[in-house]
Amino acid sequence: MGIGEESTKPIWGSVSHTSSGYALNGKIMLSSVIVLFVAVIMILCFHSYARWLFRRHNRRIRRRIRSHLRTLSASPRDQALDQAVLDKIPIFVYSSKNPPPPEEKEECSVCLSEFEEEDEGRLLPKCGHSFHVDCIDTWFRSRSTCPLCRAPVQPPFQVIETGSSSSSSPLTFPTEGCEREPIDLAGIIVDISREVEFEGSNPGLPIENGSKFPGSRVLSLKRLWSI
């Protein structure tokens, strides 16, 4: 009996040693999982806080730019874009799944901030530049060109050249303002026969009486030529 008891003692000692080792390893694993979980939570909190600060900074910049553009729109010298033209500019919703082409920038040139998820923007048809809806609408209250390239948004008015129109069509002047009417000479007939008879029947008349008639002047000139 004494020999059997002595042989079983080291076996029970090894079992107790291994069980204590498993318990220690379990505690280490549990503590490492807890530390990793806390670290992930802290990283997520820091990321969300940094993103909130970034959005807050962008909002402040947008507000400053809007206030500045409103002051500019108050001046009468600036020409605003027509509301009908502004309504025709397409609006898009930004998504990281469908980013713009690489040659285009993913930021608004008015507020100098990047587009975020589900941000609404306007795409100018001529130059292809994109801006936030609020930023570009505020800009077009005082301007009618692109903020980035200064390209006109609405088509220019058609100007007719005066040189081409004058060469193709003759100039006409209105006759309503004329006080005198044109004289019709078609119905006027000069009768010289009476003047000849009158001068032949009375040859002794002086030249002064005959000079009153235009026919006598013509006959006197003929007589001078015949002489």
Swiss-Prot record:
Q: Which PANTHER family match?
A: E3 UBIQUITIN-PROTEIN LIGASE RNF13-LIKE, RING-H2 FINGER PROTEIN ATL64
User: What does the record give under GO molecular function?
Assistant: transferase activity; zinc ion binding
UniProt KW keywords: Membrane, Metal-binding, Transferase, Transmembrane, Transmembrane helix, Ubl conjugation pathway, Zinc, Zinc-finger
- Keyword Ubl conjugation on entry: no
Q: Which reaction does it catalyse?
A: S-ubiquitinyl-[E2 ubiquitin-conjugating enzyme]-L-cysteine + [acceptor protein]-L-lysine = [E2 ubiquitin-conjugating enzyme]-L-cysteine + N(6)-ubiquitinyl-[acceptor protein]-L-lysine
Which positions, given as ranges, span the membrane?
28-48
Identify the GO cellular component terms for this protein: membrane
> What topology does the record note for this protein and the membrane?
Single-pass membrane protein
Q: What is its main location?
A: membrane
Q: What is known of its domains?
A: The RING-type zinc finger domain mediates binding to an E2 ubiquitin-conjugating enzyme.
Compartments (UniProt record): Membrane
In terms of InterPro entries, this protein maps to:
Znf_RING, Znf_RING/FYVE/PHD
Q: Part of which pathway?
A: Protein modification; protein ubiquitination
Biological processes annotated in GO? protein ubiquitination
Q: Is-annotated flag, keyword Lipoprotein? A: no
Q: Where are the annotated RING-type zinc-finger regions? A: 108-150
Protein name (Swiss-Prot/TrEMBL): RING-H2 finger protein ATL64
What Enzyme Commission number(s) appear in the record? Answer: 2.3.2.27
Q: Can you tell me which family this protein belongs to?
A: Belongs to the RING-type zinc finger family. ATL subfamily.
